[in-house]
A protein has these predicted regions:
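C-terminal and inter-domain tail/linker signature
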Residues: 1-335
Length: 335
């Protein structure tokens, strides 16, 4: 039976020190736990970063200077081998919110001096007792909607603080039964193959094969959450499918599971074109844009009950010609 306890403890220790570090000490912490060429994929506008100094100065320093003190509120934590490379590599995943006092401007957005929740999901590959590769998805659009910024139209789902699993069993700090993880991975792969095979077109009968009736779809900023199969079709599937054309599925970088939790991320996961007014921000275009996506799932028996989704919407929309950060800065400019 595979044992991922070393990898889990390494990442937990890394996160503990990282969270406590002041902006000037972040690079030192990263160097302690990561390889010299540690590659971290971050959402736009941070994007691909390599090495402790760049990761610290370009990403973590920005976060920590704007939101301090920073508190990690983790809802999902698990580890597993990667199906994509025939289970050769070992990865650790965690998801939750970073809570901080919004004290200084962030990406041109003025500080509120109030508490702010930064929804996140992150992934780390461990090799030779070091973190060598990872991804950090920060839901910046969700944060912008928390602040009520008018540049983002009303979502078709509910936007707010995203809870963890209803069963409160998302933190897999201890070793889990191997078969449980296998069952979870098999189910989410079956569901995904059906969805991609249908060109991302979903029907009620499709949902009934893989999902509980009272499913919870915790969508990203810009879309929001949906409850029940009927609510999911109305709040996400129909607006998504009606306004975007599926071009191709480049594949995922990671697919794994442990216990009743599993998921993946891609860089990108999908290539899409706008064929309508997606989120009230796009128009029909021949531009092909990259959609970087995270999906994490909770399995209940032989069906999926919950799904947490992150989309790097700032990157995707920019590929379609809509730069939300630039638009916001221009709207707030005195000239």
């Amino acid at each position: 039976m595979p044992d991922f306890q070393f990898e889990k403890n390494l990442v937990l220790n890394y996160l503990k020190e990282l969270d406590k570090a002041d902006p000037e000490s972040v690079a030192e912490v990263i160097n302690k736990y990561a390889s010299p060429n540690f590659h971290l994929r971050c959402v736009h506008p941070f994007n691909d970063l390599i090495g402790a100094e760049k990761i610290a100065s370009n990403f973590w320093t920005t976060i920590k200077k704007s939101f301090m003190p920073l508190q990690r509120r983790m809802d999902i934590f698990y580890a597993g081998s990667n199906l994509i490379d025939n289970h050769e590599t070992r990865w650790v995943t965690n998801m939750g919110h970073l809570l901080g006092l919004f004290q200084e401007p962030f990406l041109g957005i003025p500080a509120t001096q109030k508490a702010a929740f930064l929804r996140y999901a992150e992934f780390y590959r461990i090799e030779n007792e070091k973190i060598v590769e990872g991804a950090f998805f920060l839901d910046i659009m969700n944060f912008m909607q928390q602040l009520g910024l008018s540049i983002i139209p009303e979502s078709t789902g509910v936007v707010g603080i995203t809870p963890g699993p209803m069963t409160h069993d998302g933190l897999k700090f201890e070793k889990q039964p191997e078969q449980e993880g296998i069952d979870t991975l098999n189910l989410i792969i079956r569901m995904a193959k059906r969805l991609v095979g249908a060109g991302l077109q979903t029907t009620k009968s499709d949902l009934e094969l893989d999902w509980t009736e009272d499913m919870l779809w915790w969508g990203p900023g810009g879309i929001g959450a949906s409850y029940t199969q009927k609510g999911y079709l109305k709040g996400h599937t129909r607006p998504f499918e009606d306004n975007l054309d599926f071009v191709s599925f480049p594949g995922h970088i990671l697919e794994n599971a442990e216990g009743n939790i599993g998921g993946w991320f891609g860089w990108p996961s999908l290539l899409m074109k706008a064929k309508g007014n997606y989120m009230g921000l796009t128009s029909t275009s021949d531009k092909i844009a990259e959609m970087r996506v995270v999906d994490l799932y909770r399995r209940s028996g032989n069906k999926l009950s919950e799904n947490w989704i992150f989309i790097d919407h700032l990157h995707f929309l920019k590929g379609l010609g809509v730069d939300l950060l630039d638009r916001y800065k221009k709207l707030k400019s005195p000239e």
